[in-house]
Amino acid sequence: MSTTRKLTLDFAISAESYIYDLYFSEEFSKALYLEGLGFSRCEQISFDRTAANHIQRTLRLCPAMNAPKPVQKVLGDTQQYDEIGSFTPATNTWSYNVIPSTMASKIQTVGQMAVEASGPNRCTIHFEVTFDVKLFGVGKVIERFMASQFDDNLSKQKRFTEDWIAQRS
């Protein structure tokens, strides 16, 4: 059994600027994860952009974890993971897999972020992420925790991104 989240954010920036000037900017990514989300690590491991704007990127991330005891018992106090993804410019869609540093065969996270123009200098971002934890007795608890962290981080991301855009307009 898995847990899926679908959420939408709106920003006062064009879809193209959000994608290329923010989301795939190493400066913005590091600031977002380290300052905005409180992660202890954000390292861009690889970044490849073709002439046709197809992008492949890998980030190594270490989030702050305020996990319940059953989750901490299984995952530990900290969790590091690699986010490996690919951007398709024809659909403005970022598709990614999250590979945790521990229990990668038992914990799977896959997601998509689709960016669409929603007016002059406005965009809407549709997020869909699925958490699948195959650990008897605690899998569902860990999935719910991961989904809750995703929701919280998306709220923080919205505030941080809005401030970033406002300060640079």
Question: Where are the regions that the model predicts?
Answer:
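Hydrophobic ligand-binding cavity/cleft-lining segments
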Residues: 1-67
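Short solvent-exposed loop/turn micro-motifs enriched in small/polar/acidic residues
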Residues: 2, 39-40, 78-80, 106-108
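Solvent-exposed residues in well-ordered beta-strands and their adjoining turns
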Residues: 10-14, 60-64, 88, 116, ...
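Hydrophobic pocket/interface hotspot
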Residues: 18-20, 127, 161
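A conserved amphipathic terminal alpha-helix motif
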Residues: 23, 84, 140-169
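Glycine-rich portal/gate segments that line the openings of hydrophobic small-molecule binding cavities
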Residues: 43-98
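Short alpha-helix boundary/capping motifs
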Residues: 46-48, 113, 155
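Beta-strand/loop substructures that line and gate deep hydrophobic ligand-binding cavities in soluble
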Residues: 81-86, 95-147
